[in-house]
């Protein structure tokens, strides 16, 4: 039996205000995730390619062409998701800036600046951003910097502890700025 899509209460009814889900994944995971998403009513998608000017495969550089891309999907229901592009064209191939500022907490940690850009495009101030695989907490830090409500989940205690510390430091900096600013 085919699973019926879950109806989300309070889901946006206006054009351009619907939520979306962004998933980072390996290239070969995309079709599986698209099919899985359809079971839950996320019938539409846009492929994303994140282009790096560096590669983790540096030791293989003399043996073969090395990968410098990460992949992702924007998943959404039937209405186009909220899209705040300020009249600028947004391509599905996005530059991945190297993050030399943030402490490396997690092996697949995403750059805060990249996450901020995605959050700015698909949310407004005060919106909720959820990261079900929070890892380093960089998505929550990015959301916090943009005045969004961030919620993250992490099952590994070592990552949770470090991520939580980073998020709390970020919130403290924000409080200090508000208090003295």
Model-derived features: positions:
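Core catalytic lobe of class I
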Residues: 1-152, 156-161
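Short, conserved SAM-binding/catalytic segment
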Residues: 164-178
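Acidic, PIN/NYN-like endoribonuclease modules and their adjacent C-terminal/linker elements
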Residues: 181
